[in-house]
Structure formats: structure tokens, C-alpha cells
């Protein structure tokens, strides 16, 4: 009797545990869609949270794969041109000093080292590919010889070598006006046909480009304090204005959203008179821990994104209080795998990673659009092993798009400026679904009703909404991969969001 009763009790416990596990299995990566009840959405198309003013764009970081003669050069710049992106950000970066620093040695004995022969081809290809659109230029590296170091910092003879050692020193060796003069000459090369060097010799370029935006430095390299950065900004800006008077300026470019930088920089009293504060910028990268799998990436990294959005709201309170006319660009957004950073031979990146990363960018973009951020830039067009390959938007072997590129393209083509944004409500009883996917309804200026759906997990999620039948779907998922988004027309009021999928549904009628 006691044994039988014990078995009954054990059986009951097992049944309860199975029911418990069944209810929570979606959070653990179960892939069977048949066991999910569709999550029901309710949309009030009149409840407009914000009219979008947010532009989705990208950054282009200079590296050897962008040089003429690179096997992927033509494909990469063709893909850049096809995006037709406003505010594309162009950043020659310090690991390639011969591709981004125009004066590698200090002037001496009547001679200078100004040399644009390797720099110009990439700059001009970028300007041609983005012609007709406002661009952001950021030559982010102050020449190393301007910094105090125990000994001279060597420059690799090979321009294609990755050299993270070039960035050294925390105190300037030269006056700030010398730094400003470097950037004045650099901009004059592209905007005013050339410049006179430190000895009065004229260097002719023949370039007369209109530089719409210039971002001053990047990520507080050299451990710049808020005060020192602001002094540099206040010297560089008028120096550039003297040769390119219509250029507007972007400040900070912070890697970490440290409030002290925003509070100091946005305080008008901290600046010289008449210094413009047109834009501020800062960055966000998420990423899973090294021991995570694709099934757990989403739960961790989307939580990181939520933390970042909370910080954005705080930064916005500072901006609105101190400098409300200053606009904002979050001009680096991406994910980084710890096993695919700067290792010369990184671990293989799973194919699903590109979808996961694209989904995170779409989510951050949508959330920042609701916050009224002006520009959101995906990072970055081209990367490769040894140089953060997990942020690349194209295949570094072919130059063809991956899913990250296609997600940006999907957002650009379907969420125009002026769209009225209305976050849907998840019906009572289905609240758990909100942690698994994201939805944003929008009414475009052309009166089309659309629904953005983002799967935060590596399993399929069914969504139900009255009126979905007849909707046209464009989705970036593992099936479409780096190809154009898949298209389908729904035959019922239900849609199953693919694993880490990003879909735009255009409703009929």
C-alpha cells in the first residue's frame, strides 16, 4: 500500500514537472512550433507613439579589403552604392596608419611627410558610392608623433598589416593648435583643392568635395578626459570651418556612455564662443559570453540592448536639458563574438550568427526610433579575421552581403521618415511572448500599414493578428541568408516568425 501510494505521488510530481517544463521550454530553445499557441497582438493604429525621424545607415571602416586591387573591392562598393544610405560614416582607423594618417612623420629641415597616395583611392571610392547623400567623415587618428611616448612608434612598411600598437600616449607632445592645423590641412585637401604645409609649400589635390558632416575623433582614444576632448573639439572645429565653412560637426563618438562626458561637452559654458554642437554620437555593441550557444545568444544580448536603451533615455535627459537643438547619432551598433575579435585565426562563425546580429540591430533601431534618435548606424560594412570579423556586413571572401546587410536594407526600404509608430499590445495571457519577439506597427507617409516583427530567439514563434491574411511578407532569415529577403503572401491571420528572423508585413487593404 505504502509503495503504491508512493508511486502515485511520484507520478503526480513527474506530471507537474513535465507541465512546468512545457510551459517554460520556449525560453530554452525548443524549436517545435506545433506546441506553441500563437501570440495574439492588438494594434491601435491611432495610438501613435512617435512620428519617426530616424535614419538607418552604416559605418565604413577603412581596411585593406577596400583598397583598389582587393578581390572584393568592386562588390563591396557596389553594395554600398545600392544601399543609397544617408549619413554613411567613413572612418580611417588607427590600426592602418598608412591608410588613415596623412602625415606620418613630423616636419623637419624644410621637408614634410604629407602623403595621400594610399588614402585617396579609398576616400574617393567612398564619396562616389555615396554621392547624392550626406556623409559623415571621421579621420579618427591624430598622428602618433604628436603624442609623448618613451620612444618613437614605428609604422609598419606594409600598409595592409594590422597594427594595434600605433595608438600610444596619453599626453600631447605638441600644442593643440598643431593638432587643429593637421585637420585643417587634411580637410582642405578634399574640400579646397589642396593646402600649404608647415613650410609654405602648396600641395595640390584638385578635390573640391562638399563635406557635409565631420565627426571629431573617436571613442576617446588616448584616454582623453572630457576637458581635453572639448579643448581639442573647440580647436579643430574652427580650423576646419576656415576651409570648409558649410561643414557641420559631430562630437564625442563615445564607446561607453559615461554621463560625465555628455554633461561636460553639452554644457555651452565649457566651449569657446560660437562653437557649434550640431550632433553628439555614441556606440553600442552587445555579444554573448564565450560559453553560450546560438540557442541562448538572444536571451542574453537582447537584455544588454534593453540596458543600453535605458542609458539612451538618460543621455536624452541630459541633452534636452543642456543643448536641446543638438541632434544624436548612435553611429556604431553591432555584436561581437569573443571568439572572433582580433585573433588571427578566429573560431568559425555559425551561419545563424548573422541573422541573430541582424535581429539585434533591427531591435535597437526600432527602440531608438521610438526614442526620437536621429541616426542609427550599423557597424560595419567590411571586416575580416584579425579585425573583428563578427561585425562584418559582407562576406570578406566575396564582398557579397550577409544577413546583417539585408536587415539594414529591409529597414531602409520599409520604414521611411515620417512613419507613424504604434507599438502593438500583446493580449492578456500571452505576455511571455513579449520576451521572445518584438513587434512595431507603423503607418507610412504613403498610407501603408506595416508590421515589423523581430524574433529574439533561435526557434519559430507564431503570431496571430486579425487582418494578417493577404499581407505581403518580406523576411530576412536563415533561408534567405545573404540573398534578398524572402517574400510570401499570407493565407491566414497568422505568421510564424523564423528563428532570429526580421520580417516586414505590409497589410492589405
Mark where each language-model region is:
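Carbohydrate-binding surface patches
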Residues: 431-469, 500-503
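C-terminal beta-strand-rich structural cap/linker in extracellular carbohydrate-active enzymes
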Residues: 486-509
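Aromatic/acidic polysaccharide-binding cleft in carbohydrate-active enzymes
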Residues: 330-415, 419-437
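N-terminal carbohydrate-binding accessory modules
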Residues: 24-84
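Conserved, mostly hydrophobic/aromatic
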Residues: 58, 126, 186, 214, ...
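Glycoside hydrolase catalytic-domain groove-lining segments
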Residues: 287-342, 399
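N-terminal Sec-pathway targeting helices
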Residues: 1-10
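Substrate-binding cleft and catalytic face of glycoside hydrolase catalytic domains
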Residues: 83-301
